[in-house]
Amino acid sequence: MTVTPALLVILDGFGYREDSHDNAIALANTPNIDRFWTQYPHTLINASETFVGLPRGQMGNSEVGHLNIGAGRVVFQDFERINQAIASREFFSNPVLIEAVNKAKAGHKAVHILGLLSDGGVHSHQDHIHATIEMAVNAGVEKVYVHAFLDGRDTPPISAKPYLEKLEQACASIGGGKIASICGRFYAMDRDKRWPRVEAAYNLITDGQGEFASASALQGLEAAYARDEKDEFVKATAIAAAGEQPVTMEDGDVVIFVNFRSDRARQLTHALLDPDFEGFNRRRQPKLAGFYTLTLYDKAETRAKPIFAPVEIRNTFGEYVAQHGLKQLRIAETEKYPHVTFFFNGGEEQVFAGEDRILVPSPKVATYDLQPEMSAYEVTDRLEAAILSRKYDAIICNYANCDMVGHSGDLSASIKAVETIDTCIARIVKAMESIGGQMIITADHGNVEQMRDYENNQPHTQHTTNQVPLFFIGKPATLAAPGTGSLCDLAPSLLAMMGLKQPPEMTGKSLVAFQAA
C-alpha cells in the first residue's frame, strides 16, 4: 500500500498568547516560525479543559495531550473519573479501596498515603488525598500517615503553604491522619533514573530519615524556604512533634499512592516493591500487606493493585496504521519518550507491527535551564535521517524544550529553548518537502508563552489553558477555523493526509481540507 508520508511534530509546551510580555515565544528570535505564519496554512486548536477530557479550567498536560492525539477522540481522564467518584460518594465504596483499608485495620497497622500535594491536577489533586484519609479513618484505621510531595511545577514555585494548611484542616475535621514527611517532587517523582533523588525520598518514607526534621509540616516548609528551596526542591524532611519518633514504614503496613498519572510515580513504586531492585542500596524493604495505586502504573508490576482500572482505547492511530501494514516511527528524547510511545498508543506498552522507536537521551543536568537546547539537535539529526530514508509512512516526533525549560521559570533560558526549536524545525520542514511528504507542527499544551505569574508576582512554571498553534505543510489545503478544533482531531488529520479513512472509534474530524486538483 502506497501512502503520502505524514509527520506530526509536537512542540511540547508551545502555546499561543498575543501579549508579548513575559512570552518566551514572542521575545525569541524565530525567523523560521515567523515565516511559517506567512507561508503555510495555520490555525489555533484547543488543548485543555473539556476539549481533552479534563474539568473546566484545568490546564492540559503532556500525558493527556498525547493520549487524545493518538486516540483521535476525546479521552475522559482519570482525574475527572476520580473527581466524579468522590462527588457521588462511589469512591468510598470502591471495593479495592475497601480491601486496602481493611487489610491495615485487621492487622492494626498503618496506612501510608503517598502523593503530590497540590491542586495542579496534572499528576494528582489534594482532594484525592483528603478523600483517601477520610476513607481510612472512617474505616477505623488508627494510624494514617501522609507523605506529602510538594509541587511548585504545576503550581507556583512557592505555594505549598495553603496546601499543607488545608491538609492539616482536613485531618482535624476528619478526626485522624497526620503528615509524616514532606519533600519536593524533584526527589520523590523523578522519572529519569536519577536514583540518588529517589533514594532520598525512599529513606524518608520507609525509615523517617531525611536531611532535616521538623516538629510540623509548616515549620519544615518555612525552614526550607529559609534555605532558599522552592517547593519542588524541598529536601527530605521528617515531621515529628517534640518527644515523638519519626514515622517509619513497617512490615504489614499498607501503602496507597494517590497520584493518578503514572510516569512520575513508577520509580518510587518500583523501589518500594521490587525484591530485585538495583537502583540504589535499600537499607531495608518493608514487607507490606498491600500496595495500592489510584490508577494503573505499570501492567508488569503485579504487586501494585489499581483502585481505578484503566479504560481500554481501541483503534488508536498507531494500531490502525499497523493494521494497514504501514511503517511508523516514534522519536523523542528521554523526557517525552513515554508520551510518543505509551501514551500515544492509548496507555499500552505494546509496540505495534512496523513501529520503530528512537530514544535520544536527555542531558544529565539538574534543571534544563542549565542546558535549554536539551537534546533537540540530536533528535533533529535522527529525525532528518529517518525522513530522508523514505522508510516510514508516518512519523510522530516530540521536542521537549519549551515545556521542560518553561517549567524552570527562567525566561532567558526559555527564550533560548524556543530559538533552538526554531532552528531545528526548519531542517525538518526542508527534509519533508524534499521527499514530497506532508506535516503538521503543533503542541500538546501551552507553557513557555506565559513565564510570569502576575497574580502571585513570581515566575510562572506551570502549563496554561491557552490554545496552541497548528501549521500545515503539504498539498494545497485549508484548515479549520481557529478555536474549532482540538487535539483529538490530529489523528484523523494525519490519516486524511495519508489517504486513509479514519476508523469509527475515532470521533475527531480532520482539520485539513484539501483543495481540488
Swiss-Prot record:
The disulfide bridges present are none
- Binding of Mn(2+) 1 occurs at 403, 407, 463
Chemical reaction(s) catalysed: (2R)-2-phosphoglycerate = (2R)-3-phosphoglycerate
| Pathway entry | Carbohydrate degradation; glycolysis; pyruvate from D-glyceraldehyde 3-phosphate: step 3/5
How does the cofactor attach, per the note?
Binds 2 manganese ions per subunit.
Give the family this protein belongs to, as stated in its UniProt record. Answer: Belongs to the BPG-independent phosphoglycerate mutase family.
- State the NCBIfam families in the record: pgm_bpd_ind
Describe its partners and assembly state. Answer: Monomer.
Name this protein carries in UniProt: 2,3-bisphosphoglycerate-independent phosphoglycerate mutase
- Tell me the organism: Methylobacillus flagellatus (strain ATCC 51484 / DSM 6875 / VKM B-1610 / KT)
What does the record give as the organism's lineage?
Bacteria, Pseudomonadati, Pseudomonadota, Betaproteobacteria, Nitrosomonadales
